[in-house]
């Protein structure tokens, strides 16, 4: 199957035979019996994939919530899903339940390890802890490489930095650490989505990522600027007006012998999830991160005071 917004090219079904050679796609695209006008709907794609001679896998490399909401459609037909798209697993709790119920119904698999921690085995480790009977009491960490870079540069644990907050944000944007619109990092929602996924695996029924406190680093006066190229330029131009606010946060931490970091935490016993700024001793693991490194700690009954 080869698709674009105006046309979809399909190999014959149900046997997918004869297959269309890759080099002949242009010729095949001119054959009415092999094409369909416009893009296929999720149900049509699922039906097509389900007719494959072997097991089919949907690999979703988008961050599209509308596609993620269609995962149950594929899973019920026995089509496994592999994706880094965290939106489907951090959206409304009903979708989370529907995804895994549909996977069980269709005897399909769901792999979303890279929704948290990129390539690190974060979710599989947490699932193994839960599956082997350990009791997770708390999860804490720095979950955003972008925000890690910002605070490690702005308020390093060793040495000092005179850099203004807006200059560090501009540097991160220039280096490609931030999204095209840095507000997509500074609003904390990406971290909140990751915390939602972890909390659900740990056993908490978090309804959605906006159901718990999220501390945004976007000045209120700039939050309503449009997401257009002009709006992004306005945001970056005006951000220096608010450098004093972040300098005060850094100075307050320094007066206590600490540094400020942007972290997420889950208190399983208290059923509390939060995302925002916290102060840490300079010799702590979180304070000692370098560059854009992340750190995630699992506190469990089995591991006691020493987190995994």
Residue spans for each PLM region:
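Short acidic, glycine/serine/threonine-rich loops at helix termini
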Residues: 11-17, 71, 93-96, 121-127, ...
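Rossmann-fold NAD(P)-binding glycine/threonine-rich loop
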Residues: 64-77, 86-114, 118-129
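Hydrophobic beta-strand scaffold residues
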Residues: 81-82, 109-110, 179
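Rossmann-like NAD(P)H-binding beta-loop-alpha module
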Residues: 105-107, 111-175, 185-191, 197
């Amino acid at each position: 199957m080869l698709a674009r917004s105006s046309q979809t090219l399909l190999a014959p079904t149900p046997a997918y035979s004869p297959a269309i050679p890759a080099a002949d796609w242009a010729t095949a695209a001119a054959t009415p019996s092999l094409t369909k006008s416009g893009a296929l709907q999720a149900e049509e794609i699922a039906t097509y994939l389900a007719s494959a001679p072997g097991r089919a896998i949907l690999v979703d490399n988008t961050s599209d919530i509308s596609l993620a909401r269609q995962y149950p459609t594929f899973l019920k037909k026995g089509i496994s899903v592999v994706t880094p798209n965290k939106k489907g697993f951090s959206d409304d709790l009903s979708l989370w339940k529907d995804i895994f119920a549909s996977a069980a119904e269709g005897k399909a698999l769901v792999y979303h390890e890279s929704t948290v921690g990129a390539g690190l085995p974060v979710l599989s480790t947490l699932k193994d802890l839960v599956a082997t009977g350990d009791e997770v009491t708390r999860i804490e960490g720095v979950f955003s490489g972008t925000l890690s870079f910002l605070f490690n540069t702005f308020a390093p644990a060793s040495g000092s930095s005179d850099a203004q907050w807006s200059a560090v944000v501009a540097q991160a944007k220039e280096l490609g650490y931030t999204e095209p619109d840095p507000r997509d990092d500074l609003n904390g929602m990406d971290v909140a989505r990751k915390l939602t996924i972890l909390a659900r695996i740990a056993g908490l029924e978090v309804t959605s990522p906006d159901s718990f406190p999220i501390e945004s680093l976007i000045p209120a006066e700039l939050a309503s600027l449009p997401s257009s190229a002009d709006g992004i330029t306005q945001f970056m131009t005006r951000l220096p007006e608010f450098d004093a606010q972040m300098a005060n946060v850094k100075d307050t931490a320094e007066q206590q012998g600490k540094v400020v970091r942007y972290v997420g935490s889950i208190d399983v016993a208290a059923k509390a999830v939060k995302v925002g700024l916290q102060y840490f001793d300079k010799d702590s693991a979180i304070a000692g991160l370098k560059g854009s490194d992340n750190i995630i700690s699992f506190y469990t009954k089995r591991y006691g005071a020493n987190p995994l």
